[in-house]
Amino acid sequence: MIDPISFLAWRFWYFFRDPVRRPPPGRNVVSPADGRVLYVRDVEAGTLPNPVKSGVRVPLDDWLGTVAPESGGTLVGIYMTPASVHYNRAPIAGRIVAVAPRPAKGENLSMARAFMRLLWNMPPYEEDCGYILQNARNTVAIDGDFPVVVIQMADRFVSQVDCFVRPEQQVEKGEKFGLIRMGSQCDLFLPKRAGVTITIKPGDRVLAGETILGTY
C-alpha cells in the first residue's frame, strides 16, 4: 500500500523540483528533457517510419505538429519518467520563432507501453506506441546557429503542458522554457544541414540542459 504522505511529497514537491543545471560550453546541443532516449531517427525526404504500422512512413510535419524547417535530419525522442525533472530546457541558444500547440487527434493515449519497453530493455522502444502521432503537443521552434524544433508531448494523464516563452524571445542554451506535468515525452528535430554528430543512443539516460546530445 502506498503511504499517502510519501505520495503527496512526490506529487507536490519531488515532482516539481528544479535543480540547478549548468550547460556545457562549446558547440553542442543539450538535451531538452530529463529521461531515457526512446529513439534516434533519421528523417529522409520529410518522412520517417511509422511506430505503429511497419513499412509505412509518416510525414515529419505530422510528427512535429508544425511545418519542419527542413526535410532531412535527425529526430531524437526522450521519454520523461515519473522520476524525471519535468522542466524542459532550450537545446541551443537562439530566438523563439514559433510556439504552436496542437490538440490530440482524438483522446490522449497512455505512454505506459514505452515506459515498460524501456524498463525491460525491449528495443525498439517506440514500437506500437500510437500516442506519438495522436497525443496533444506543443511545438517550440528555435533559430540559433541553425533551426531546431522541440516537441512537448502530453501523456494520457497530463493535466497541463506549460510553455514559458513567446515568439521573438531570446533564450540561452539550457534555459527553462516549459514544464510538462506527470509522465510525458519531449522530442527534438535537428536539420541535416546543421551537421550535428549525434553522441547518444536509444536507452541512454539524459539530463535537461546538461547532457550533450550532439556536437557541431
Question: At which residue positions do the language-model features occur?
Answer:
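Contiguous, well-folded functional domains in the mature portion of proteins
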Residues: 1-216
